[in-house]
Structure formats: C-alpha cells, structure tokens
Amino acid sequence: MTSPSTIKQRFLSKPNQLGVVAVGFNGGQCKLGVEAAPMALVEAGLLDQLRDDLDYEIHYDNTVHYYEKEIPAEDPDHRGMKKPRAVSAVTETLSSQVYEHSKEGKFTLTLGGDHSIAIGSISGIAKATRERLGREIGVIWVDAHADINIPEMSPSGNIHGMPMAFLTRLATEEKKDIFGWLQEEHKVNLRKLVYIGLRDVDRGEKKLLREHGIKAFSMHDVDRHGIGRVVEMALAHIGNDTPIHLSFDVDALDPQWAPSTGTPVRGGLTLREGDFICECVHETGNLISMDLVEVNPSLEAVGASDTIRTGCSLVRSALGDTLL
C-alpha cells in the first residue's frame, strides 16, 4: 500500500488533480497496435492505482480518442513525411485537449500512441504554461531515439522520429494542415531540452545535437556515470525554476523490460533506472505533465503484459509512488 506524495508541487495550483488524455493514434509510424496501448494501460488498472493508492482526483472522459474524424481520406507524402496531414490534425486537436487540463493547474498525463503525439501534448503544455505562469517549460525526453529529424533528413519519413524538430522549430512548415498551426507559444527552447537513454541516433540528428549544443545523455553516459549522476546533471541543466514535462518512450528501456514496442534497441535502461528517473523528476516538485508512449500490446504476445506493467510503473513513479 502506497500513500500520496508529500512533495510540494511548485508549479501546479491543483496538484492532487490529474487530467488524463488517452490517445489511440499510430499514424506517426507504420506498425499497427500502438493505438491499443491507452486502453491496455487503463484496463491494467493504471488510473485506479493513481486514484486509490496515490489519492489523485482523476479527470478523464473515459474515452480513448482515435480521432477518426480528423484523419483525411487523402494524405500524400510531403517533404518525405508519411501521413503528414493526419499527424498534424490529430496533434492539433490533442494540443487543445491537453491545454484545457494544463491551464487549470492540474497535472496532465497523456497516454499514447506513438511518439508523434508529443507534438500535440507538449505544444499544449507549453502554451498553457506560458499563459498561466509566464514561463517556458523544460522537457526531459527519455528515449532510445532523439526524435529530432528534420523531414528531409529522416531515413524513414515516419513522423514519430520528428516531434522534437517541430517543437523546437528546427523544422517549420507554412502549410496550415501540415503543422503550420504550431506557433511561438507552442515552442520548446533548445536550451531547456534534455535527453536520457539515447543509443540509436541517426547521423543527421547527431549533427543537430552537436551544432545546437543540445544536452543529451546517451547510454554511454549512463554506463560511465551511473543513472543517479546522469539525472542530477539533467535536472541541473534545466534548472530549479522551470516547470518540467517528462516525455517517456518505453523503448528507452531495454527490450528485456519493455519488449512490446515498435522500435526496440538492445542495451537500454533497466526498469529500476526508468523508475528512478521518474522518481527523481517527481522529487523536484517541478513536474507538471508527462507522456507515456510507444507501448504496443500487439507485438510479443508474452511481452505485452510485461511492457504494460512497466508503463504503469513509470507513470506511478512520476506521480509520487515510492518503494518505502
């Protein structure tokens, strides 16, 4: 039996209230199944655990959003991007949904879906935080991949490898129906972005990370310094006066712990290292929102329940669950 967090939340006016958006969207990549993750997480008892064990008042519309009405019949490639209009329309709608929760000072949890949905969740959080607090957000992106491909650089054309490029405005697009809706108010400052867990980074992304001085901790850094020191350095980079959004892709974890994901990469974080990152970010009192993405229950029949359990554990840890 756990109990509610005693950490004072610095940037949430309603810290015991949790706004949840369930996003059943797979259009940022090519594998079916990731759209089933929000329902699987809810059915595994995630929201019940947050309510019963951690005492959150949950604001959830009991709906997994598949956004069928937003998805156009015709969606030809643009600048090499696959399904650009679908991803743009879905993330624009999601941005508004997340904004509505966040502007009230609630913690906002977005359950994906593939990682392209972060274009929606993070833009909504950034806008709400600028309006509510007059501050920029910091983003901690825990992932095997940097997801900062500019469309023309992307080897695959899958938009789940591009969200950070659009959110930081390294990639821009004039067309209203292809991310032209993203404005300055939605932007993430490159100096307030930190990566943890990287180990499969495209050549063009490495160049961008270096050129822009983006703070990134690869698995090499985790091996060298230990996860404790890495998290300490990541948080120091963002600073203690910044509201934090945590975007957690389960493929940051080694496939041993999260096998059911679309792009697994060996040599990743352990389950405890993943939970530890979430625990430490919670302990700052600065965490205002989180995404959990890329759980794909249709891959690896045996591994699906393990991966769902892992996802639940990460979210609980970020929301104040402790071992003792």
Swiss-Prot record:
Keywords in alphabetical order: Arginine metabolism, Hydrolase, Manganese, Metal-binding
One GO term describing the cellular component: cytoplasm
Protein name: Arginase
Source organism per UniProt: Emericella nidulans (strain FGSC A4 / ATCC 38163 / CBS 112.46 / NRRL 194 / M139) (Aspergillus nidulans)
Molecular function terms, GO-annotated: arginase activity; manganese ion binding
EC number: 3.5.3.1
Class of enzymatic activity (EC top level): hydrolase
InterPro entries: Arginase, Ureohydrolase, Ureohydrolase_dom_sf, Ureohydrolase_Mn_BS
Positions that bind substrate: H145, A146, D147, I148, N149, S156, G157, N158, D202, T263, E294
Gene designation: agaA
Gene Ontology biological-process annotations: arginine catabolic process to ornithine; urea cycle
Oligomer status and interactors: Homotrimer.
Reactions performed catalytically: L-arginine + H2O = urea + L-ornithine
Sequence similarity: Belongs to the arginase family.
The organism's place on the tree of life at top rank: Eukaryota
Pfam families in UniProt: Arginase
Annotated Mn(2+) 1 binding sites: H115, D143, D147, D249
Chain coiled-coil ranges: none
Cofactor(s) listed: Mn(2+)
Cofactor note: Binds 2 manganese ions per subunit.
Chain sites annotated for binding Mn(2+) 2: D143, H145, D249, D251
Annotated metabolic or biological route of this protein: Nitrogen metabolism; urea cycle; L-ornithine and urea from L-arginine: step 1/1
